[in-house]
Structure formats: structure tokens, C-alpha cells
Amino acid sequence: MPLRRIVISGCSGGGKSTLSLAVAVQCQKQGGNVGFVDCEQALSKELALNMGVDPNKFVVYQPRDGEDAIDMVETMLKSRAFDLVIVDSIAAMTPRAEIDADIEQQHMGLHARLMSKFMRRVYSLVSEANVVLLCLNQVRVNLQSYG
């Protein structure tokens, strides 16, 4: 696998998380350690074990919000303890301001700004740490573009 940044996009339920676990197993078979940032809070530990993931070489972190996820990815990369870091998923990296806000408040562009911050803080570390960053993302339909 090339050592850099990979994004896998697809529809919900399309097998992206399962594919990432298969990649994790292959990384571990080559002696690697895997960090899994579970932004969706949906990782099936049973599925991971059934697929052959070694829990001794597999660290799972479930962030509270998008900023927490970025901090954890950055920490994992700086530690140089991981050969593969998986982010599941970019779409689930909810900005802290959106979580903390009243339901009526509109927060246009927060996710885009968070992703820009993610790129600035994390992408340069990938090359320095000699690690694969595998990000999963969901394809969404923009209903406002029709009609």
C-alpha cells in the first residue's frame, strides 16, 4: 500500500468500514499497528475480531466531536506508534460548535472549515510519520440541486 493519504468514498452501507478492517488485518500481518478513529461510534468489535483483527495491535478511539477526532489523529501520527490510521468517517466529524449549539442555530460552513483545519494539521504529519492515513467518507445527495 502506498504510504500517504487515501480516501474511500461510497454510499452508506457500501462496505467502506469492512474494507478498512480488511486493510487493517493486512497491515497487522506485516507487523503493523493500527489506530482506528471511530467518529461514527459504530465499529463492530465482533466483526473486527471475526475478520482477524489482532486487538493487541488495534487501538480504537471514539471522539466526542470533530476537533477531538483531529487531535487524536494528530496524536497518533506524532507518536509514530502506528503504521495505519483509519478515520471512520470524515462525514461524521461533527464540529464542536454544532454539537454545543441550540437546535435552532444555523452553522453554515462549519464542517468545511473543520475539514480545512484537518488537512492543514494532519496531512503534513502523514509524510513525516511514514504512515498510511485511510479516511472513509460518505457520498450524499444534495436534494436542493434538483428541480
Q: Where in this protein do the model-derived segments appear?
A:
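Structural motif
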Residues: 7, 84-88, 134-135
